[in-house]
Amino acid sequence: MDMYVIGLQEVNSKIINFLSDLAFDDPWSIFFMTVFSPLGYIKLSSVRMQGLLLLVFVKHAHIPFIRDIHTHYTRTGLYGYWGNKGGVTIRMSLYGHMICFMNCHLPAHIENAEQRLDDFEKILEMQQFEDENVPNILDHDILFWFGDLNFRIADYGIHFVRESISNSRYNLLWEKDQLNMAKKKEAFLQEFIEGPLQFKPTYKFDLHSDVYDTRGQKTLFWFNGKKRKPAWTDRILWRVKNLSQHSSEDGDLSEGEQTISVTLNNYISHMSYGISDHKPVTGTFGLQIKPLFSTPLVTLNPEGEWNAAQDVLISYSTVSEFPSSTWDWIGLYQVTFRHVNDYVTYAWVKDDEISSSEDVTQVYISADEIPHAGGEFLLCYYSHNMQSIAGMSQPFQIQPSRRSAEKELAQENINGIEKPHSPKPYDEF
């Protein structure tokens, strides 16, 4: 897997938690970084609006080829003044192709289907990016739209819906799914593709169970005894710009001279999770793209053997069109680093420069900044103008300092001291 995109809704947004999460990484981000960083992924970007959270994790190998990373959010709750509902997006250029991920939480309740569509259109209209070629969400080559879209199953009664689910006859419910119904009428929705709903409706469940809602609906002052009708509220759709008309019914795009296409490999829910009244949904996609460039903007390497006994050198070179800045810097990272600010130390490319030629520039890092314990590390060049990593070195070893090595050896000797051997009954003499 090359990339993980995670959209959460209804994350704890109490004011104390929210303010704390603004200053520090929220618990969900920390959890996912703890899982993914040992596997060679870093958090490329994230955006949060109250209870909506969107995270993108990417394999190291792709980082130098991802550019123009921007985030956006749109509030639609309380007439646009409150962010309990709305959409958050992360867009980027991946090997030269513009891709956008949009996580939405749309209005609830079966009678609000039109409001859901209105809010989605509002999000599409209001989110503008500072890019002449790709200013709007629908201008991106690929758009993934997902989240708690809150569309319900219309017309059918709760008993028919539950009976159809019990018999795994989900197809009986598809034509009355409000999103499917809207796609038949709304032209802009017809450009979006979704895999078949071959899993149970993902809402509403009793907590910590796979049993559909057994409690009455809570109104302003009391429970009215009416139970929620199951629905596919949690969805993943995608749109390929100007290619939707070439899509086959199973979601694959027709072959030809296309430089980019999307294939859905699976689309499933996960019934074992019970911390919410929704069941999470995942989609696994194959993204076939023809790279518009294959050379990183910056190539950098550590010079010689690195240890904490001496200053160390970094050599780097850039392509001619690279928009360098005096605010660019090179970070030293452990190979399991979590995000771009998770560096051990860094050097300013201008202030710490010691030599420069037409082809190669060298900067130094003081010996005092080098980790004494050593280990496996890598270097990343961060571009201020691009607000992203423009180059990454191969992993390399930093040798432990003599002091660190002696300390480790002494500890091993202490751990190696054993009690005198007591012969076992059958030891031979």
Please give the residue ranges for each predicted region.
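N-terminal, active-site-proximal structural segment of metallo-dependent hydrolase catalytic domains
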Residues: 1-46, 52-54, 112, 120-124, ...
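Catalytic lobes of large eukaryotic enzymes
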Residues: 34-39, 102-107, 111-407
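Residues immediately flanking
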Residues: 8, 59, 149
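Acidic, serine/threonine- and proline-rich intrinsically disordered appendage/tail regions
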Residues: 401-429
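Short amphipathic alpha-helices and their capping/turn segments at secondary-structure boundaries
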Residues: 1, 89-91, 134
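Structured beta-strand-rich core segments of catalytic domains in phosphoester-bond hydrolases
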Residues: 11-100, 107
